[in-house]
Amino acid sequence: MYDMVVTLTGLDMARMKNGQMTRATAGYAYVGGACVRNSRLSKISSVALVEDSGAYSGVVVTAHEIGHLLGAVHDGDTAPSYLSRSPGAKTCPWSDGYMMSDFRRTSRGLRWSDCSTRQMKYFLRTSTASCLYNTPHSSSHPLAGPSVLAGAGLSLNAQCQADRGTNACYHDQRVCVQLFCYYKKTGSCYATRPAAEGSTCGRGKHCLSRKCVIRSRHYGKGNT
């Protein structure tokens, strides 16, 4: 069995809100769902679903949903009733733009707010989270990590093509914070996420943690 599982889908996710279907959904997870299995209700809550275009558009959303599974609500919200002793996130404004917000327009979008950190620390001390501390089964075929960063193998245009079927509007340091793609319907540029880690952001530079830095010799060359 697993502690948490995240499923990535290339399908366009949607949900019902106030009786209307909205497609403005990129991920879903249960708050405090890690390790939770209710055999009486045949329900498993330790799951998350994330939409990904195939060009790493779901990476940040995956981290956001894992935050939910580890007990963090959206910044600005109160804790759910079943986590009544959790500090919640009422004192951390949504507009600050940390990981548990979708207002992620600065480098803070890859960091947890103080509220998120406190909530996850609280959850990890509960008995619910006990499965996260057991010794995992060893595998005779462990998965090997990639030798290059994700963006090193995908140009900025390719990332926008996967997301919106158009090209990137900019090819400079701005893409590390927000990847702007051309939006045919309005004739303007639109961004929903940063370029993938390792994406080229200038001559001899690439994106790392939402910053445009000189490319390290430890990483492969990226594409523009």
Protein language model features and the residues they cover:
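Extracellular (secreted or membrane-anchored) zinc-dependent metallopeptidases
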Residues: M1-T224
